[in-house]
Amino acid sequence: MAVDVSECLAAEPRRAILIGMRPVAIIGIGKTAFGAFPDRDLRSLAVEAVRKSMESAHVAPGQIEAFYLGNFAGPSFVGQNHLAPYVASAAGIHGVSATRFEAACASSGSAFFHAWSAVAAGIYDVVVVAGVEKMTSQPTPVVTEILASAGDLGGEIKAGATFPALFAMIARRHMHEYGTTREHLAAVAVKNHANGAKNPDAHLRKVITLEQALAGKPVAEPLTVYDCSLISDGAAAVVLAPLERVAEFTDHAVVVKGIAQTSDHVALDEKDDITTFRAVRTAGEKAYRMAGVGPSDIEFAEIHDCFTIAEIIAIEDLGFVAKGEGGPYTAEGRTCLNGEKPVNTSGGLKSKGHPVGATGVAQICDSWLQICNQAGERQLRRHSLGLAQNLGGSGATCVVTILGAAA
């Protein structure tokens, strides 16, 4: 029977985008350690990650056809603009399109999405996607102010609200609506620190107890210092190529099965419900549909835990658990390394660190390590299908990527 393609595309608009697009693979990764590095500048961190990714992919700088850089606030943190060619040229990549992407903490996730789009569409074959941030060159109050610029200038920033304050409001509302407790928040921190302690590249390789997490220095009630991600320096990079060309470069490749970038209001008070991130739900739904899988098929996830409540909400919004069940699910140990749905095997932003412009690509790198059976002490038994979720602001941008082993 003949099929009316136009009817199919009308019923499934996302499929129209994908017709004629090529499967894309990650053929190499590279990253720096995350931490506080007073003797390193932004460019040296980014170049280290880029060069490592090209070495991993067995490609030379002259083979790179485009360069994508995620960076949130290089001009504010280190006073340098025009960052993409600044980094690309230092890594030996010349004469190609070099573009910086800014989407708050989802900057490199956004860069990855646009790089994937270009390779999938056949515009380029071999590209590098990097993310970098150098944050510790500024004192903490200045860093907090720079980060707050990803909020709403006319309301939140004018009122003096920082992101710890905004996520504290989110946490309080989630507690009110669903009975989430401080113990549930602390369980996220304890689990992620345990994972990060096994990650040689993590910023804070320190195991903590539930009691320590609960007794942490208050930041914004109910959040303590243990509920907040770290101020870090670091960089990460990947090399993308069409799946059909993988054999030319490597026998270690990971395929992008599904991907989506979505957006929502920047201001928290413009959202209908602050106990959910609509951008996460929408990106997850689109990525699942593209990959042809559902939440139950995902074997592990790298989740954007900028604050512990963000991880709890994300695993609910991504369909891993029902709304309101994220806290108990975590406290029961079901997201631990040996749990049914391991989350943040890298240590997450809480322990691995959060150089904001690097985080999205770093999540991709950590997922690649799991799928390629190279995660060391943190290696999972079930690791063929993973998900990375990168969030910007208080949920204004989200990139969800589903990654799987190459057949």
Q: Which residues make up each language-model segment?
A:
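Conserved active-site "lid/cap" helical segment
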Residues: 18-106, 174-181, 203-209, 279-297, ...
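Condensing-enzyme catalytic core mediating Claisen C-C bond formation in acyl metabolism
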Residues: 19-43, 153, 187, 218-282, ...
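Conserved catalytic cysteine-centered active-site region
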Residues: 20-21, 25, 74-127, 134-166, ...
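Beta-strand segments within the central parallel beta-sheet cores of soluble alpha/beta enzyme folds
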Residues: 61-71, 98-103, 127-131, 183-190, ...
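Short glycine/threonine-rich loop-to-helix capping motif typified by GTGT followed
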Residues: 74-82, 268-272, 305-328, 339, ...
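Active-site-proximal alpha-helical scaffold in enzymes
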Residues: 102-133, 165-198, 238-244, 352-375
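Extended C-terminal subregions enriched in glycine
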Residues: 277-280, 285-308, 317, 349-352
